[in-house]
Amino acid sequence: MAHGEPYYSSKPDKDFNFGSTMARRQMTPTMVAKLPNFVRNSPQAYDWIVRGLIFPTTGKTYFQRVVVITGGLEDGTYGSFVFDGREWVEIYPIEHLNLMSSLKLIHKANALQERLRLSQEEKATLALDVQFLQHENVRLKELIPKPEPRKIQMKWIIVGAVLTFLSLIPGGYAQSQINNTIFTDMIAACKYSTETLTENLDLRIKLALANITISDKLDAVRQILNFAFVPRAHWLRTVFYYIHYYEMWNIFMFVLAIGTVMRSARPGTDLITLATSHLSGFRMAVLPTIPFHTTMTLWVMNTLMVCYYFDNLLAITLAILAPILGIIFLCFMEDSNYVSQIRGLIATAVLIAGGHACLTLTGTTTSLFVVILTCRFIRMATVFIGTRFEIRDANGKVVATVPTRIKNVAFDFFQKLKQSGVRVGVNEFVVIKPGALCVIDTPEGKGTGFFSGNDIVTAAHAVGNNTFVNVCYEGLMYEAKVRYMPEKDIAFITCPGDLHPTARLKLSKNPDYSCVTVMAYVNEDLVVSTAAAMVHGNTLSYAVRTQDGMSGAPVCDKYGRVLAVHQTNTGYTGGAVIIDPTDFHPVKAPSRVELLKEEIERLKAQLNSAAENPATAVTQQPVVTLEQKSVSDSDVVDLVRTAMEREMKVLRDEINGILAPFLQKKKGKTKHGRGRVRRNLRKGVKLLTEEEYRELLEKGLDRETFLDLIDRIIGERSGYPDYDDEDYYDEDDDGWGVVGDDVEFDYTEVINFDQAKPTPAPRTVKPKTCPEPEAETQPLDLSQKKEKQLEHEQQVVKSTKPQKNEPQPYSQTYGKAPIWESYDFDWDEDDAKFILPAPHRLTKADEIVLGSKIVKLRTIIETAIKTQNYSALPEAVFELDKAAYEAGLEGFLQRVKSKKGSKKLQRAPEDQGAQNYHSLDAWKSLLEPPRERRCVPANFPLLGHLPINRPIFDDKKPRDDLLGLLPEPTWHAFEEYGPTTWGPQAFIKSFDKFFYAEPIDFFSEYPQLCAFADWATYREFRYLEDTRVIHITATEKNTDSTPAYPKMNYFDTEENYLEAHGWAPYIREFTRVFKGDKPEVLWYLFLKKEIIKEEKIRNSDIRQIVCADPIYTRIGACLEAHQNALMKQHTDTSVGQCGWSPMEGGFKKTMQRLVNKGNKHFIEFDWTRYDGTIPPALFKHIKEIRWNFINKDQREKYKHVHEWYVDNLLNRHVLLPSGEVTLQTRGNPSGQFSTTMDNNMVNFWSQAFEFAYFNGPDKDLWKTYDTVVYGDDRLSTTPSVPDDYEERVINMYRDIFGMWVKPGKVICRDSIVGLSFCGFTVNENLEPVPTSPEKLMASLLKPYKILPDLESLHGKLLCYQLLAAFMAEDHPFKVYVEHCLSRTAKQLRDSGLPARLTEEQLHRIWRGGPKKCDG
């Protein structure tokens, strides 16, 4: 490259010449040598930009220019690079639209070339495979042994000749001897001649007189058939006479005998059958029955035919009894063999009985032979002629089908006559817009789409699982991204920029489904069809035959407005799913609290309606789950049943529509609320997560959860009907609430936006016994003055414990004040300033979705501050929060702390600066020299002291006055448990969890066993392959937790910290670590308040919990949250049960899974100090296994971040409440982000090691092994157990891993019954029984936390009743809970809680409803 000439990297780059030529002239060989890896033979854009715009500076170099290159990289991304004098540095991409379009086409061309190359390679490989298979076929044909010609044995020829001779002699017949010689009876011959002459004379007379009758003609035909005109001594008469005499049997038998000897595979049996058939006299009738026989039944038939020769009555009796005896005595056979034997016996019975009847009546069995032969021929007639003929073209494609049946001309005539009636109307024209259609192309196939708004709409099944699809429009191909797929079979695709000027289809505001038009592309041709439609809930049906490529086509009315999206065809009717404006935007799922409140109101409305009208029923539509799996016969059957069910539903709706004018409607009645589809009922969710389940064992369920549970039960009571009668369908049902029949709505009374409220109010508790009269709530008019607002506030009850109100039509929370109370308060200048965050704290989503509304609100705030008039703020903030909630964003009122309810938190001193408590290693600047050792044991280092104000003593044992309502217990086993209390000695004792025995270097000592354990772990968790690292702002964790030191000095919870500073510190610290810094994280240690044995409390044996800085925890969530979520989704098939629910048959399903393995041994394993004694080498190894599942690119990119994260897990700087700082280097910390998941993987890895230790690395035997784990809980089934298993396995874990298993904690049985898992013992029906009911009773009578009210106590008792569902009826714990419920129910008659759960409700919760029943 000559100096001063523009530089071009390739010919396309020179042809396009994007950017500045001056910048190209500045390129030097050094700059060219260090160019980034752009796509080969692709253009780049060169810019000549002022240096100060790229590198901020105030010096003289600000106006110097630098070269910026923009292009496409080999990894498929788009980037810009600036040369800083030494190397190219990546900067924020500069958009060049022409370059981006060119790169897109180049990428597509390269992809197509790669696909072509791979296809050609695959074609060549397949062609080579075909040649190999052809050669192999020829070679194998040569190896096939050729059948040798059968050798005829002389003995069978002799036997056949003897049997044939015996059968042909006159004595071979079972009849008396008769002289059948010809010309011996001369008198009869003469008499016959005279009669013949007389008949001929009479016939000639009649012919002469022309007096021939029909009877004479029939006699003539009969004489011809009887050879009357053939001379008596003619050879033809002699041949036919002898053939008739022998009935062709002897000749046929002789031929069969020769053929049997020559070709039969069992000549002896066949010859004996011929002989017995001749001996018995059945002859030809035997032959058609032989194919029905097996070898056994054939010998039975031969025996009975021989018996018939001697005693026919005995043979008939045995033949009739043979099928009956065979049905009884041959039942041990398999089905196919059993049916064959019975069929042969029945054929024998028919032959013997029928043959005897024929011989008795006619003297021959010819009629029986004809009947059997006719039946067989009719049975085989379907083989000769098919049901239809298929006409194919040269390529083998079927172009036409012709039925083989003969058309009924008369039927077709009347059908056409009926259809071609007199024209009674004129068809209307319809509007179509072909320019609004496009073709959606995916690797799985093609579909039709249409432009509407800013999206391309099509069917979801046409898109499949693809994130990007190709949009074909007017011969051009565009790549587009799938934006959103709702629950319906609809997909919304982002419209490419080049296609925005195209025509658009609008949605119909007033749908008319009487006549619909379907437009679609089929084989690049536009097809249009018009038909009448029927509405079935959210779908349409119409008589249109669906062709390939029509999925996703618009279904429009006569004005060209979209009604629905064409979906499918089930044989006779086309189907479409109705589309409405709400489908275009994803709706944020309501929170758990909102769902609970909504369902409480629905339940109460349903109960009120049921009380007024007992016939009212609530129908819950079943949830249809589509899974991608292999298709089996049962799947095909289910698919056909679903299609037929849909067709019958369509037919039923059409018939009901025809009969509607003739049906009478009862006056004075309305069916609103009966059987209506409850669209807002919660569907298919687990009753309890693992966190709630753990809490349930200690504290029970609260009132909200229990009411939600009751609502679920009532919603599932009518689980069997699957249809929706149109009598119960209400088109005006908007899903906001359900009320009784006679409730009249006043739509102007109160405006309630509960569905989109940003800050849900808590549930109300039990109202006062005598509530004071309340003023009627009026709607809030935001245009009124401040005085009227104050007057309105006086009308609305603002108590933190509101009085009980009657449920309103649009209210979702029982007795809840209107949502306006959250916004209608005395606004001041501080409220106005802090309602909106600073512009730099707004997220990208806020700016895109709410940009205009935020600007509007800022203007209103500025005006309000200037005029000191804040009356317009409530409405403006409410509208902003409403728009935010509809877009799935958090409301702004929720983002700030309410002045009335917020806690005054201490802020950081001004002279410290933000860095002192934002950074992960801020604690180091506050570290002081060590002081007195108080809570740190002597074998742990004392690194220093930090200023902290936390207690190290806790001797509180709460006394709950509500427990005075409960009866005195007679069972005192619970007294050995109690709430934990501690002093400094408990902190020292808690460090003992890390010590039991020293592990060896098992990776070096047992490499083969470790390799087997690794193989088993990778095989078990293979579904984690290609998991991803997520952004820190997308992580989820409990924000109501301590933010650790030093943030805990200024904020009580992480939620307070987030509200004060947002995500900026999190992103800053993550970037800091990503750039290479390795700050040392500080963990905060505290003891757990729980119910344990009194002996442990006296010994100060309390569990310690450590928690790290929330920024560090969320960095761990970035690395492992995706894997943790997948583990929770695979509890049914994987070993880890984190996320598992024992409710709705979950417990029994898991136990049945272990039983179905068919192993003889079941093992319950209980560890001691499990997570504290995990060897650091093993813990680090498990973390490496998990990291190997991460996507390769991200695995390399964030490798150093992961190493830093694991290093801070293994080497923990720990702060105690006494201010002492120490170092922990053992175990799995109980407060890290993935404690349970890591414990699960360690548990499984150690089991695989243990299996190989006792059985060797046998991979095939390991596949019969199965286990379920939850942290340190373990229940497994194994095909073999060595002798002295308990002693040997305890020694193995102690000597190799240094882990502690106490004697008696390893239980091995030949049945799973009696073993326990997660606090439940398995009973005979594989159902759960609480393992330690005395501990549950202690948490009731000796709690570590006081319950807030009597409703919470009653809810806790209901929870214990649920846990004791499968306990013995006379168990003291179950009896005591029932006694307590009777006490508390008397005090809570108006609370809305049930007095107790019925047996049916308990079984529904544990086993599931009629659609989910598992046991």
UniProtKB/Swiss-Prot annotation:
Sites marked Cleavage: Q175, S176, Q419, S420, Q664, K665, Q755, A756, Q912, G913
GO BP, sorted A to Z: DNA-templated transcription; proteolysis; viral RNA genome replication; viral translational frameshifting
All residue ranges annotated as the RdRp catalytic domain in the record: 1160-1286
Coiled coil: 104-142, 587-616
Listed GO MF terms: ATP binding; RNA binding; RNA-directed RNA polymerase activity; serine-type endopeptidase activity; serine-type exopeptidase activity
Region annotated Disordered, chain positions: 753-813
Post-translational modification: Cleaved by the viral and host proteases. The protease is probably autocatalytically cleaved.
Enzyme Commission number(s): 3.4.21.-, 2.7.7.48
Residues with O-(5'-phospho-RNA)-tyrosine modification: Y693
Keywords, sorted A to Z: ATP-binding, Coiled coil, Covalent protein-RNA linkage, Host membrane, Hydrolase, Membrane, Nucleotide-binding, Nucleotidyltransferase, Phosphoprotein, Protease, RNA-directed RNA polymerase, Serine protease, Transferase, Transmembrane, Transmembrane helix, Viral RNA replication
Compositional bias annotation for Polar residues: 800-813
Ranges annotated as biased composition (Basic and acidic residues): 783-795
Catalyzed reactions per annotation: RNA(n) + a ribonucleoside 5'-triphosphate = RNA(n+1) + diphosphate
Record-linked InterPro entries: Astro_1A, Astro_p19, Astro_VPg, DNA/RNA_pol_sf, Mamastrovirus_p20, Peptidase_S1_PA, Peptidase_S1_PA_chymotrypsin, Rev_trsase/Diguanyl_cyclase
Membrane spanning residue stretches: 154-174, 239-259, 286-306, 313-333, 344-364
Gene3D superfamilies per UniProt: 3.30.70.270, Trypsin-like serine proteases
Gene Ontology cellular component terms for the protein in this record: host cell membrane; membrane
Active site: H461, D489, S551
Family: Belongs to the astroviridae polyprotein 1AB family.
The protein's name: Non-structural polyprotein 1AB
